[in-house]
């Protein structure tokens, strides 16, 4: 390996450790010629996966494309960069473990949506609007209606739990009855 500063090949490894949940090795290196220190990452090289796009064309799987789309969808949400990177790592790992040489862009999009729904509903709807090519407000409404039942169940459960504990302890009004 060459030094990124002076291009000499006199490099020594100062430290090695597992990174990305064991998916890579992080090495801290030092050039013996100029003293420059830098970090490298080693990853397993998987078989290349070809993505079949909507128009039938094929291109190599590019995790950065997925990450960019997820980052756009997650702008101004509480989702962290680490969570976004983990989402992309999960998808890439799942595809590699399936040992598929080809995958459709539609399948990748569904995998992203499935994971975004658990991270941020706002990011989910943003990603879905591009991925599913929403044409108008009706498309947004339809997508939101599909998200609504789990939210309604969670809200009803929360209100029931709250009213049960309130009525047992203080005799306060039944919130579920007032808002049903």
UniProtKB/Swiss-Prot annotation:
Its cofactor is Zn(2+). A zinc finger (unnamed) spans 3-34. The keyword ATP-binding applies. Pfam families: ATP-cone (PF03477), Zn_ribbon_NrdR (PF22811). Signal peptide: none annotated. Residues 49-139 form the ATP-cone domain. Keywords: ATP-binding, DNA-binding, Metal-binding, Nucleotide-binding, Repressor, Transcription, Transcription regulation, Zinc, Zinc-finger. Binds 1 zinc ion. GO terms for biological process: negative regulation of DNA-templated transcription. PROSITE patterns: ATP_CONE. Negatively regulates transcription of bacterial ribonucleotide reductase nrd genes and operons by binding to NrdR-boxes. Belongs to the NrdR family. This is Transcriptional repressor NrdR. It comes from Synechococcus sp. (strain JA-2-3B'a(2-13)). The gene is nrdR.
């Amino acid at each position: 390996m060459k030094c990124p500063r002076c291009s000499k090949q006199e490099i020594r490894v100062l430290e090695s450790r597992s990174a990305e949940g064991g998916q890579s090795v992080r090495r801290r290196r030092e050039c013996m010629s100029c003293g420059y220190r830098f970090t490298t990452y080693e990853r397993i090289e998987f078989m290349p996966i070809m993505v079949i796009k909507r128009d039938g064309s094929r291109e190599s799987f590019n995790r950065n494309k997925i990450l960019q789309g997820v980052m756009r969808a997650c702008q101004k949400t509480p989702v962290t960069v680490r969570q976004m990177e983990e989402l992309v790592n999960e998808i890439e790992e799942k595809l590699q473990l399936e040992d598929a040489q080809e995958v459709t862009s539609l399948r990748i999009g569904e995998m992203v949506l499935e994971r975004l729904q658990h991270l941020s509903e706002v990011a989910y709807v943003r990603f879905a609007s591009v991925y599913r090519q929403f044409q108008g407000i009706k498309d947004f409404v339809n997508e939101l209606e599909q998200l609504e039942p789990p939210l309604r169940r969670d809200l009803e459960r929360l209100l029931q739990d709250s009213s049960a504990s309130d009525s047992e302890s203080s005799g306060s009004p039944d919130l579920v009855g007032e808002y049903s």
